[in-house]
């Protein structure tokens, strides 16, 4: 178990087909204690919808809550939610040495359709909450003398906005792109405290949201002919959390399977 004994807060664990679920499952299999977070009202608003069984089914599929798995429902649009989430994780399992920020607010607004309210909400969930999570994580890591133990890890997520335009999803593109840009800055802020910060761009990933037409169209731009899987994204995260990745910080890992955007 390569990640035996670690304690991770993983955000965005709300659907069994999602990347967050795959990350939580992988970390549990690798020996990590996982405090998982989700917010199903956002899924309810989206075309894919929330899982029928809700978060109870999600936690059951991960083995059920107990000594190594806990779950919290929190709206990260609320300014005090990130710190409260870290506090709850610490109260349950002690020092959190691993933070995986996987949650996101999706937003399909082009330039003509976007609104100030949607821009503010995407900023609050995707950027502000991420920064406040990292801030709270670093504070509790320092308070628990985490640097002396070594191995602090933060992993953020982006979606390739630094590689190509996304003009039909401007609020989402702006805020997820910001996380990719913040990775280097946060890595510099935390490297002296014994914490690495990296970002994962998982490429087109089959989480059940794409139509058959879109899946086929994008699939033609992927050398394998098929989209990446959530388990493959989780494997990249596990790699960045391991001891062998101790010297890797400030990087964005483009795990896109050779995605040829010019074909798509």
Regions found by a protein language model. Name each.
Residues 191, 196, 248-250:
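Short, small/polar-rich loop/turn modules that mediate ligand/substrate recognition or access, typified
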């Amino acid at each position: 178990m390569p990640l035996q004994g670690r304690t991770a807060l993983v955000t965005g664990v709300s659907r069994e087909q999602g990347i967050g679920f795959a990350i939580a499952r992988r970390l549990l299999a690798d020996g990590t204690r996982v405090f998982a977070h989700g917010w199903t009202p956002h899924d309810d608003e989206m075309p894919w919808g929330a899982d029928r069984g809700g978060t109870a089914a999600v936690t059951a599929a991960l083995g059920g809550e107990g000594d190594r798995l806990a779950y919290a429902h929190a709206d990260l649009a609320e300014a005090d939610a990130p710190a409260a989430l870290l506090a709850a994780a610490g109260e349950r399992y002690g020092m959190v040495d691993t933070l995986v920020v996987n949650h996101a607010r999706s937003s399909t607004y082009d330039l003509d359709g976007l609104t100030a309210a949607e821009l503010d909400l995407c900023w609050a969930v995707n950027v502000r909450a991420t920064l406040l999570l990292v801030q709270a994580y670093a504070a509790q890591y320092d308070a628990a003398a985490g640097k002396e133990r070594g191995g602090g890890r933060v992993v953020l997520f982006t979606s390739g906005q630094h590689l190509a335009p996304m003009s039909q999803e401007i609020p989402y593109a702006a805020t997820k792109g910001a996380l990719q840009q913040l990775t280097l800055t946060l890595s510099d802020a935390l490297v002296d405290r014994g914490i690495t910060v990296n970002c994962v761009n998982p490429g087109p990933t089959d989480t059940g949201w794409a139509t058959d037409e879109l899946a086929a169209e994008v699939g033609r731009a992927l050398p394998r002919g098929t989209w990446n899987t959530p388990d493959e994204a989780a494997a990249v995260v596990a790699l960045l959390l391991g001891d062998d990745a101790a010297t890797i910080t400030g990087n964005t890992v483009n795990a896109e399977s050779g995605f040829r955007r010019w074909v798509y």
